Amino acid sequence: LDRARKWERRSLNFKQEVDDMKAVLYCRVNGPQTSFALDAIKGQQLYLMDYAKKNNIEIAGIYLDVGYHGRTMDRPGLQSVIQTLKEGNADVILVANYNRLYRGRFPQELQELPVVSLKEQNRKRERGGKEHDI
């Protein structure tokens, strides 16, 4: 069972779905580059890194966007995340919360990518940007 098909199996629980996968970690804050914003993004990063370590998830990259609104795709970190997955260098995007990746309806380009939110661990977004229980 390859990793892409493993992702599609709904009978697996969250731990089984992400265990032994390669993930890109993505963090975002939309405020200006202040000490508060930098602390917030550092908190997201540490939260994701700690989770990955505890669950044997290999980190393929960590991408950050500071000062970018969540309703735009024009973010350098986000574009790097998409490129990393398209090149096959990671299996999943790991975020602290779905709204760190995008606010509102997921654009088509994001709808095609596997995303796991730690805050919503029992849910995942699939094609079409719809969430469902796993």
Q: What is each model feature region?
A:
Residues 1-134:
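Short, structured surface patches at the beginning of a domain
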